[in-house]
């Protein structure tokens, strides 16, 4: 009896500690259900999720139809995933197919006469029948019923943007794409431009920043915030199943263990939500809409509103805790109204009584500029980047952190005052820039050409957020702190006026460039509400490296510029789309000449040219902030940048480049992706071109663009170092050429390719052909590698059906790795010594011989090309082939 009593008491305590969710409507904020919306609605979104458990029109679907009968054409219905229970859409004639079709018809019939748009998004249950192939079956069925683009994202891809209006953007995410185990879906991403989870985050960050100033709805099946069972809130009944006490223990384990990806406690789910939360802070009007939980919820956390409407055919309990403002475990729907004044409201409707149960405002109306600024300004303004107190440091401090270029941040320089209304015929602000440390504003002229104004004072907190705290929003925590001040001081290792010298030098050697000009930008009416964050300081204003500058000589008169991500996609499309490799090598040598170590992929744009039958891309380097930088100045950073491999790129500018390998830490993966065929004579010719055309006279001319107030002995010191490095450029080039030739990387196209690998003693020749009409056709790559220089050659077939033929006699071969990629590949390995073949285990491939070592695995990372796979360790650069220890690394 005593034992039973103890157990019962323990059970009650556990129940009380864990708390219970329920099915009742719960409120923590004012409920405005009786308030009529007198605002003019711009667009309405009808939200219903998890509606796939109903084979007929009842409950929430009936409620939705009644709402749609009154809806305007400026409306969109979003089915928020789990459109079919329990396991997606089976194949024709498979068990469960009829029931699944009936479930879809019940939903599509509701919108058959709807005058607005309808979008279905996938949930986890929609993935449970063949993964990508099952999704495509559902996509095909829905698009036949409703029309094109009614199932998004398409082709099992992760993200899609829909422009609803000029002020409203819809970003659709397939959250199960991120959460699922890719190794169980060998065909995943084969029809997608995004191939990695990190690339997905890059795309989301780009879209969320581009949508600044607009109401941005992010639709994804799995909620970012929830107070339902997937967030660890359970009903009393769940504590009793399968038995009392055991049910409670089960719930505690589920809440703390994160065993499955359906719950937020799961590591991958939590990683997704934390990163999305952090990136979404860059847009002040983001609204999440989700299903997954079979309830109606409204939560506002971290300034981000979350609408949960996942009770389209089921209901489950919720609990009013934390930042929740409303929850109800009832079958129902939600309506989101975006109003013409920029405000937005949400209303929830329950099938119990078919009535509105909660309504509240999400965002208030757009703020209008209330301050009227003067329109007439003087011609010049003297201003400094930092206040005097920010550059005054003790002797002890400077012994630790160095002198840097700190002094010049506090020097008041005379800059022309600019009125944006008249510059370049008049410029209008478009949106904030997306840099990780620069405070920038994008501007547009009357022709649509874009410009950028960037403050010379960098944003330390923004840098911390982007680099050190990707999964946690910290901007507010670091403002006006010692950490922010210290980082601002570290930034003084780069010379604030260095970018103004680059154009003169680059012009002489045919390297494209932007043309920054120093201005003082006062707060003014042209900035509108951007006056809150911009104005009354020094800026550089330059052409944005983008389309619309076809009259610009420094862009080669190209009217079309693309990003690095888009360049790589283009190069994989066809052998007639090529990179001017020589121009890229010249630009990279110029980076090393001026000491610009910050050359990651987003620091480049690519100008497009049509030359005969070829499309040729040439590099346009941008953001030259780190030219001539002395980041390693001072005792502390001088030591740290030598000890920590990740900081070795921050070498202080001097006549010599002590380690080209580590200086090029950031651009190395891109170099390996783009510099494929060029031999040493190409590099040598570019060195000669640079050293011949950049003379001391040209260097003197370049530095006349420094403000006269900072043109002192330090400028002469930089010029002396630049001349010295110019004299050492051949040595620098030779060292880096050897570094990037240690590994050869050959890539095919996303069409049928034939790779001919001929092996000789100490040498290997790789020739790549297109296959046309079943036979070898045009050669698009040919190079002979020497074993003295190259340790390994990696050959990626990419997509479509590729053939690999390995021939040749001898013993002392370069190791060759063949990575087939998607579709059916053929391997004819006549000499298998030091040949490793990687391909999907569950896909059909043909092996003509049994020679060579086969690594057949469905490991996604092993089989899919990603130029960022190349990794550093403390001694050498190595590739990453998944996590298989047998890869030989």
Where are these regions (language model features)?
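Conserved ATP-binding subdomain of kinase catalytic cores across diverse folds
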Residues: 418-562, 620-630, 635-639, 643-655, ...
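C-terminal catalytic region of ATP-dependent kinase domains
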Residues: 469, 490-496, 608-783, 787-792, ...
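N-terminal active-site segment of His-dependent metallophosphoesterases
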Residues: 20-98
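ATP-dependent phospho-/nucleotidyl transfer catalytic cores
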Residues: 521-596, 609-618, 630-633, 697-709, ...
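Solvent-exposed loop/turn segments connecting transmembrane beta-strands
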Residues: 55, 881-889
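Extended active-site neighborhood of metal-dependent phosphoesterases/phosphodiesterases
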Residues: 24-29, 89-216, 230-259, 263, ...
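Active-site neighborhood of phospho(di)ester-bond hydrolases with catalytic His/Asp-centered motifs
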Residues: 47-49, 76-82, 117-124, 217-221, ...
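A short C-terminal boundary segment appended to hydrolase-like catalytic domains
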Residues: 302, 324-378
């Amino acid at each position: 009896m005593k034992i039973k009593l103890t157990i019962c008491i323990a059970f009650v305590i556990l129940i009380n500690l864990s708390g219970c969710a329920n099915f009742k409507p719960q409120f923590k904020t004012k409920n405005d259900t009786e308030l009529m919306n007198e605002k003019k609605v711009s667009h309405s979104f009808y939200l219903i999720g998890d509606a796939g458990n109903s084979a007929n029109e009842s409950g929430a679907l009936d409620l939705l139809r009644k709402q749609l009968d009154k809806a305007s054409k400026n409306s969109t219905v979003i089915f928020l995933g789990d459109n079919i229970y329990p396991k997606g859409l089976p194949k024709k004639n498979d068990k469960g197919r009829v029931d699944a079709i009936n479930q879809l018809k019940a939903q599509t019939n509701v919108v058959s006469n709807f005058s607005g748009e309808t979008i279905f998004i996938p949930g986890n249950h929609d993935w449970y029948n063949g993964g990508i192939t099952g999704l495509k079956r559902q996509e095909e069925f829905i698009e036949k019923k409703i029309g094109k683009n009614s199932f998004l994202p398409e082709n099992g891809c992760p993200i899609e943007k829909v422009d609803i209006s000029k002020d409203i953007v819809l970003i659709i995410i397939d959250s199960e794409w991120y959460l699922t185990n890719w190794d169980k879906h060998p065909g995943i991403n084969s029809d997608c431009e995004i191939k990695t989870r990190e690339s997905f985050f890059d795309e989301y960050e780009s879209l969320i920043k581009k949508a600044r100033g607009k109401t941005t709805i992010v639709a994804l099946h799995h909620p970012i915030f929830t107070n339902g069972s997937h967030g660890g809130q359970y009903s009393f009944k769940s504590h009793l199943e399968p038995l009392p006490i055991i049910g409670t223990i089960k719930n505690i384990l589920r809440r703390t263990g994160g065993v499955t990806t359906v719950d937020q406690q799961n590591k991958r789910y939590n990683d997704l939500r934390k990163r999305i939360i952090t990136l979404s802070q860059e847009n002040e009007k983001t609204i999440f809409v989700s299903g997954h939980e079979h309830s109606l919820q409204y939560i506002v956390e971290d300034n981000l509103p979350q609408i949960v409407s996942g009770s389209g055919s089921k209901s489950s309990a919720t609990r009013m805790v934390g930042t929740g403002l409303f929850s109800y475990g009832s079958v129902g729907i939600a309506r989101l109204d975006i109003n013409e004044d920029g405000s937005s409201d949400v209303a929830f409707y329950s099938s119990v009584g078919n009535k509105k149960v909660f309504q509240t405002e999400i965002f208030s109306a757009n703020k209008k500029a209330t301050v009227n600024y003067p329109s007439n300004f003087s011609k010049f303004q003297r201003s400094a980047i930092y206040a005097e107190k920010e550059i005054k440091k003790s002797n002890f401090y400077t012994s630790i952190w160095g002198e840097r270029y700190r002094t010049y941040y506090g020097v008041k320089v005379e800059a022309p005052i600019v009125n944006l209304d008249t510059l370049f015929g008049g410029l209008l602000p478009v949106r904030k820039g997306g840099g990780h440390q620069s405070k920038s504003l994008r501007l547009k002229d009357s022709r649509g050409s874009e410009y950028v104004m960037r403050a010379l004072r960098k944003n330390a907190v923004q840098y911390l957020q982007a680099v050190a705290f990707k999964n946690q929003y910290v901007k507010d925590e670091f403002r006006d702190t010692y950490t922010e001040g210290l980082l601002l001081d570290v930034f003084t290792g780069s010379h604030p006026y260095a970018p103004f010298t680059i154009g003169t030098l680059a012009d002489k050697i045919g390297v494209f460039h932007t043309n920054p000009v120093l201005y003082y930008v006062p707060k003014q009416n042209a900035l509108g509400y951007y006056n809150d964050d911009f104005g009354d300081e020094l800026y550089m204003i330059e052409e944005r490296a983008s389309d619309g500058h076809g009259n610009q000589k420094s862009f080669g008169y190209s009217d079309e510029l693309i990003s690095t991500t888009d360049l790589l996609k283009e190069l994989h499309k066809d052998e007639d789309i090529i990179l001017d490799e020589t121009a890229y090598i010249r630009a990279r040598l110029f980076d090393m000449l001026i000491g610009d170590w910050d050359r990651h992929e987003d620091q480049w744009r690519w100008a497009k040219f049509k030359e005969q039958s070829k499309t040729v891309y040439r590099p346009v380097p941008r953001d030259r902030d780190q030219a001539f930088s002395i980041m390693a100045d001072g005792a502390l950073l001088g030591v740290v940048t030598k000890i920590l491999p990740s900081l070795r790129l921050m070498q202080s500018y001097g006549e010599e480049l002590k380690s080209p390998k580590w200086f090029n830490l950031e651009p190395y993966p891109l170099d390996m992706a783009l510099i494929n065929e060029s031999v040493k004579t190409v590099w040598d010719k570019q060195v000669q071109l640079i050293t011949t055309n950049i003379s001391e006279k040209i260097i003197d001319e370049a530095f006349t663009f420094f403000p006269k107030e900072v043109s002192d002995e330090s400028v002469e010191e930089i010029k002396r170092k630049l001349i010295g490095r110019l004299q050492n450029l051949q040595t620098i080039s030779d060292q880096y050429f050897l570094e990037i030739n240690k590994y050869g990387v050959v890539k095919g196209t996303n069409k049928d390719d034939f790779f001919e690998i001929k092996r000789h003693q100490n040498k290997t020749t790789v020739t790549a052909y297109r296959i046309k009409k079943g036979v070898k056709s045009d050669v698009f790559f040919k190079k002979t590698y020497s074993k003295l220089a190259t340790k390994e050659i990696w050959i990626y077939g990419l997509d479509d059906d590729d053939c690999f033929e390995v021939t040749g006699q001898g013993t002392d071969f370069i190791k060759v790795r063949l990575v087939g990629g998607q579709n059916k590949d053929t391997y004819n390995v006549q000499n298998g010594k030091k040949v490793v073949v990687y391909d999907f285990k569950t896909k059909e491939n043909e092996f003509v011989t049994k020679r060579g070592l086969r690594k057949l695995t469905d490991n996604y990372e092993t089989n899919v090309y990603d130029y960022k796979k190349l990794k550093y360790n403390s001694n050498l650069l190595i590739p990453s082939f998944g996590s298989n220890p047998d890869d030989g690394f």
